[in-house]
Amino acid sequence: MASTAPNEQFPSCVRCKEFITTGHAYELGCDRWHTHCFACYKCEKPLSCESDFLVLGTGALICFDCSDSCKNCGKKIDDLAIILSSSNEAYCSDCFKCCKCGENIADLRYAKTKRGLFCLSCHEKLLAKRKYYEEKKRRLKKNLPSLPTPVIDNGHTDEVSASAVLPEKTFSRPASLVNEIPSGSEPSKDIETNSSDIVPHFITGYNDSDDNSGSSKFGSNVSIDVIGPEENSTEHVNDDVKEEAEAPSANMSLNVATDPTLSCKEPPSHSRNLLNKTPLRNSSGQYLAKSPSSYRQGIIVNDSLEESDQIDPPNNSSRNASELLTSVLHSPVSVNMKNPKGSNTDIFNTGEISQMDPSLSRKVLNNIVEETNALQRPVVEVVKEDRSVPDLAGVQQEQAEKYSYSNNSGKGRKISRSLSRRSKDLMINLKSRATGKQDSNVKLSPASKVTSRRSQDLMRDNDSHTGLDTPNSNSTSLDILVNNQKSLNYKRFTDNGTLRVTSGKETALEEQKNHSFKSPSPIDHLLQSPATPSNVSMYRTPPLDSSLTFDRRNGSSYSNQNYSIPSWQKTPKTQLENSDNFEEQKETLYENSESRNDPSLDKEIVTAEHYLKQLKINLKELESQREELMKEITEMKSMKEALRRHIESYNSEKNKLYLDSNELSNNPPMINEISLGESPPVKHVATASSVARSSVKPKFWKFFSSAKPQTEQSIQGVSTNNTNSIVKSAPVLLSAPSSGSNSGRLEISPPVLQNPNEFSDVRLVPIENDANMGQSKDGEEYLDGSNLYGSSLVARCNYENNEIPMILSVCIDFIESDEENMRSEGIYRKSGSQLVIEEIEKQFSAWKVQQNTETPNILTEQDLNVVTGVLKRYLRKLPNPIFTFQIYEPLMRLVKSKKMMENLPFVGGKLSLEAKNSDTYMSSKSALKNILEDLPREHYRVLRVLSEHIEKVTRYSHWNRMTLYNLALVFAPGLIRDFSGEKDIIDMKERNYIVAFIFGNYKDILT
């Protein structure tokens, strides 16, 4: 117990846990540290009471440089720091908050994202919102089914060997070859049709994009209708199949049988099944209107009145008599037409329809999808019959016929084709191209007029049929059409005005030439009504008035060319209008068609116009801003020119004043007393002679008028016995009334580099009115060095009889007396208390050599930074600095000419051995020695003593962090400066370098 009792009396160090028995110690609250333990735990940097440091919760010390910075605001954290465990990022308590709601994060529960920190509530909301949008995106994603590939049944592909059978030629039908289908082929099937089941497979007139053959848009439309079985007539179809197996059809068009596009067989219901599986596409706007379902019932047009009794009514048992009557009233009228020779009706096997090429079938299915909604209209079924006039499809080669067949049994039904009414939008835009050029001699028959009126009435209905699906009585034209399905025919006008049909085959061209007709009517697109009902084709191209034109409306595409449709009389040629008028009207038609835009294009035009207006407004704003900027630029240019002229005048004035000041310095004037009769005594003001730079550089001086007392300043110089240098003395301010000789002259004071407000010993001294007195007592006291802050270094040394001033030696001895002072961090860099420094300066100024022979003990118990401040301040207040004004320019020229900063750089605060062994170093050293020889002896000794002291301080640079170059930065402003003070910024680097170079190599330079 006796051994531990003494240890309990001593405090223990917080860091090393050892007892503090001797020496100094740092105390912070109840904790104590050794002086060597009071350091940063990271960088081991020694700390002091003036250092910026923090005490961690563990008791460890950390300096300001090593402390954590906030990740958000970037400021040093001087209190509580929150460090994230995942990223090791530090946040201050103010920045540790949610970036969404801005609330502080409680309980250190957070979520870190790329956007920043989130509290848990905001993070959960963000996750829920993201999940909701992903689910919504997944629901809205559409996957449209792809078009099914047509299935080709190879089991039914039998080659069709057709033998040509020449049917009986009639007066109204030219000869055409038909094929007799052998008994080994698949029996044809009788199909019961209904208007609701009829869907065209291929109608190019409504979709120009599918027409890849380059044919005309209107005259080259090909329509292939596939008639599928009705769902509620299955038994009837099966009976027809059985009867068709016993007696297959014997006749078929030779060209249809031999067409390569009909080489594959498919079940008759295959197209219907594919239609049911195909998704409906969006159709254009003109096909959206549909008639009611009750009206979608076609009427059968019979060949004879006798056969009309055998045709069963449409299979729709759910409809009552009133509905049937209404549908009949709203449907096209039935026309009974006599067939002069019904046995020669062109028929073909519907089994061959399924034998189409897959490419054609796919195209057919695509067109079915596009036209399904448009073609559910009331239709008229007309039994195919022979005609003695050329069919309309024979002229317009690309409009396909719809074929049907039936056997001669009692149950068999005449297969008819669908003739739905033309679209209202198409028919209302028809107009004759020959308006105004009609032959006045040609008159239409009453039947033709009735047909014209009926066609106009039909245009008012929602007719969706092409209007060109008429029975083909010209079998040669039909053969040409079927034979050239792969290469669709082109219609063009020849030079002689005849209509020519060209195709890939020469035979088709020749046959078409032989069967082209001339219409006696000059009215284009107008069909004359024949005299007999046998020549009537219901709902083909309706007769039009001359006021109707072909036009493009609502996005529907029709032909821009005008074709003359032959009448139903046997005439050999087609009459066309004049070619010049045709070209002129075609251009007019093109302009009219282009002038009408669809709604989407109109919307785009409106949007584009809106954007154009906005751009024009922005352009006007930019132009106005540009004008304002140009005005400002012009004003700035004029201002710049005015400033340049002022600067030039000021520079010339400055140079003149500088020359005057040099003359005054070389020839210091004697200040004489000016006396005028009964004028009041003149006051002489003497100020402390410090040439230290003021805070505001006196570059301009005030002009005094002749009516006021003029001020004159002069810089007095005293030539010493030992040196030739001129020591600047304190300026003397003399005020005197203006005399008669200089009343009209403006006096300009010379530049003075001092700030009298900086010194405490400024006092006003009255001047005796004695003309023989050269200078005042204060001037004599100033010149002998008795005044501390006003005497030159040479005068002060002579006054004290010392090699260096006492204030310098006392300060240096105090700093070097204690090793702790030399290790103090930031020595000469940190500033002491200004009040204490001024108090010490007053004590040094009051000390007199004659009264006190001993060195004063002024710096006892003073702070280190206060003592270093007194030393630096005395050097800075010297009227002529240590490196005098006379050697300033030679030193700067030496540094710049030798390029010492580039060739002899400081590395780690000192010159390297390689640099010291270079020729540049040797030449620079010798030149520098020659320049420093011009210094006064007192300046030279002070420079050497100061260099030795700086070397001792740099030995402790590991502790005090003050290298040679850092100390040079501190001392350079007080040791070297130019006389005018204008080159402080320009020569700053050179001044700092030369001071560091001399401090580091003073042993070689200051010998």
Curated annotation (Swiss-Prot):
Family matches, as InterPro entries: Rho-GAP, Rho_GTPase_activation_prot, RhoGAP_dom, Znf_LIM
GO MF annotations in UniProt: GTPase activator activity; metal ion binding
Gene Ontology biological process terms from the UniProt entry: actin filament organization; axial cellular bud site selection; budding cell apical bud growth; budding cell isotropic bud growth; establishment of cell polarity; invasive growth in response to glucose limitation; pheromone-dependent signal transduction involved in conjugation with cellular fusion; positive regulation of pseudohyphal growth
GO cellular component: cell cortex; cell division site; cell tip; cellular birth scar; cellular bud; cellular bud neck; cellular bud neck split septin rings; cellular bud scar
Comp. bias regions, Polar residues: 250-261, 270-293, 467-478, 529-579
Annotated positions of the Phosphothreonine modification: 278, 532
Domain Rho-GAP: from-to ranges: 791-1006
Region (Disordered), start-end ranges: 203-293, 401-478, 505-600
Keyword Repeat among record annotations: yes
Outcome (variant: residue 37 to S): Bipolar budding
Coiled-coil zones: none
Keywords noted in UniProt: GTPase activation, LIM domain, Metal-binding, Pheromone response, Phosphoprotein, Repeat, Zinc
Keyword Signal found: no
Residues recorded with modification Phosphoserine: 291
Biased composition (Basic and acidic residues): 454-466, 583-600
Entries under Pfam families matching the protein: LIM (PF00412), RhoGAP (PF00620)
Residue span(s) of domain LIM zinc-binding: 13-66, 70-122
Residues flagged as site, Arginine finger: 829
Compositionally biased region (Low complexity): 212-221
Biased composition (Basic residues): 411-421
Residue spans crossing the bilayer: none
Job description of the protein: GTPase-activating protein (GAP) for CDC42 and/or RHO1. Negative regulator of the pheromone-response pathway through the STE20 protein kinase; acts at a step between the G-protein and the MAP kinase module. Dominant suppressor of bud emergence defect caused by deletion of IPL2/BEM2. Involved in the control of polarized cell growth and proper bud site selection.
Miscellaneous: Present with 396 molecules/cell in log phase SD medium.
Entry protein name: Rho-type GTPase-activating protein 1
Organism in which the protein naturally occurs: Saccharomyces cerevisiae (strain ATCC 204508 / S288c)
Encoding gene, per UniProt annotation: RGA1
